[in-house]
């Protein structure tokens, strides 16, 4: 019997790019989240306490 059950824990995360800045450098880091707002929250939660500023979050667009 082959019964595939994705269950309620199945999440469709998307890739976003967060621009993170310090006083000397700026770099982009990947963030995986369901929405743009959630990606911003995750980026701020992860990088602001470490002394960085999150200046931009954008969706990852696959090249055509």
UniProtKB/Swiss-Prot annotation:
Pfam families reported in the protein's UniProt record: RNA_pol_inhib
Disulfide pattern: none
Protein name per Swiss-Prot or TrEMBL: Bacterial RNA polymerase inhibitor
Keywords, in A-Z order: Bacterial host gene expression shutoff by virus, Bacterial host transcription shutoff by virus, Host gene expression shutoff by virus, Host-virus interaction
GO biological process: symbiont-mediated suppression of host gene expression; symbiont-mediated suppression of host transcription
InterPro entries cross-referenced by the UniProt entry: RNA_pol_inhibitor, RNA_pol_inhibitor_sf
Record note on quaternary structure: Interacts with host RpoC; this interaction inhibits host RNA polymerase activity.
Highest taxon of the lineage: Viruses
The keyword Coiled coil is assigned to this record: no
Job of this protein: Acts as an inhibitor of bacterial RNA polymerase by interacting with RpoC subunit and thus preventing promoter recognition by RpoE. Non-DNA-binding transcription factor that plays a role in the transcriptional switch that abolishes transcription of the viral early genes (class I) by the host RNA polymerase but allows transcription of late genes (class II and class III) by T7 RNA polymerase.
